[in-house]
């Protein structure tokens, strides 16, 4: 099965794409009219080449993570993708050399079969709205419980190559490509688009990445996934996938302290999985400075 997920049905309709592309044209025309600046096609296609380079790297890292020895896991995968895909999106020339350096390290680790912990017990897909940047929970999961976070919902963005050569045909295609990238922006590509992209594709990624566990973040201030709670539970059970709900309120420790977030996983692993931590010394961590 390919790592490229099935695309959203409504976004494949020609009339939808034409409407979205026209919106991009209108936005560019508005900026040109009110600023006196003109769209630079040469610069656009330079950026498009870097966007494609980023997409190829992301697919290669996902392919690597589908093996028994994943190398690009946890928050580094998601935080780097967020920055590169959404914040940079091909504009900076500094990213491709960094990408190549990262790839060399990852390939070297894969050949050497390097592991982040002494034992990998479970392979997990991380789904939902995540707080891992502020508490580094994914790194903790690996070292405390041997749960390897292979990828996360916010990193599973565009997998298409866009037109990156300046031709009259590609200039027209570029409006559609920009529309597609906006349609498949981080968060929007999962929480907007219906049941298929939020629920069905999760199980496809579990199969592709050989995951036996899903860490389901439940952000208390965001109800995007709440309506699907029962569906997630029922379908995970039918597939034999362990689904762990972990509540949080992002960086706010007044609602859920960092240890309270970790304890939800601790309780699941001890009571449901009947497992002991790989490293009991980090099961409970001091969080006095969480504020």
Language model feature labels by segment:
Residues 21-160, 191:
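A charged, amphipathic alpha-helical module
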Residues 114-116, 155-163, 277-291:
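Domain-level signal for soluble alpha/beta catalytic cores
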Residues 1-10:
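Single conserved hydrophobic/aromatic residue that forms the stacking wall/gate
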Residues 139-148, 166-173, 177, 181, ...:
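Hydrophobic alpha/beta core scaffold segments
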Residues 14-15, 158-165, 254-257:
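Short, charged, surface-exposed secondary-structure boundary motifs
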Residues 15-21:
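Long, hydrophobic, well-ordered secondary-structure blocks that form the structural core
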Residues 15, 190-193:
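TRNA-recognition modules of translation machinery and tRNA-sensing kinases, especially anticodon-binding
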């Amino acid at each position: 099965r390919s790592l490229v997920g099935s695309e959203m049905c409504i976004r494949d309709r020609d009339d939808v794409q034409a409407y979205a592309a026209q919106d991009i044209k209108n936005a560019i025309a508005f900026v040109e009219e009110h600023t006196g600046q003109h769209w630079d096609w040469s610069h656009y296609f330079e950026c498009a080449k870097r966007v494609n380079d980023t997409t190829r790297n992301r697919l290669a890292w996902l392919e690597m993570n589908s093996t028994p020895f994943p190398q690009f896991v946890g928050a580094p995968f998601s935080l780097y993708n967020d920055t590169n895909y959404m914040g940079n999106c091909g504009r900076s020339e500094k990213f491709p050399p960094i990408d190549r350096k990262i790839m060399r390290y990852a390939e070297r680790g894969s050949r050497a079969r390097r592991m982040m912990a002494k034992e990998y017990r479970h392979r997990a897909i991380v789904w939902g709205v995540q707080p891992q940047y502020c508490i580094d929970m994914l790194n903790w999961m690996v070292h405390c419980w041997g749960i390897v976070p292979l990828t996360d919902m916010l990193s599973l963005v565009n997998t298409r190559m866009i037109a990156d050569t300046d031709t009259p045909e590609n200039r027209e295609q570029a409006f559609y490509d920009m529309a597609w990238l906006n349609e498949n922006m981080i968060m929007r590509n999962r929480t907007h688009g219906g049941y298929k992209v939020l629920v069905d594709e999760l199980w496809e990624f579990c199969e592709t990445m050989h995951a036996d566990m899903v860490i389901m973040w439940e952000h208390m201030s965001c109800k995007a996934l709440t309506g699907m709670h029962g569906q997630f539970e029922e379908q995970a059970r039918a597939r034999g996938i362990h689904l762990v709900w972990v509540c949080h309120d992002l960086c706010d420790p007044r609602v859920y302290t960092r240890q309270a977030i970790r304890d939800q996983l601790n309780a699941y692993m001890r009571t449901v999985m009947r497992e002991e931590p790989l490293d009991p010394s980090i099961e409970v961590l001091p969080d006095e400075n969480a504020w």
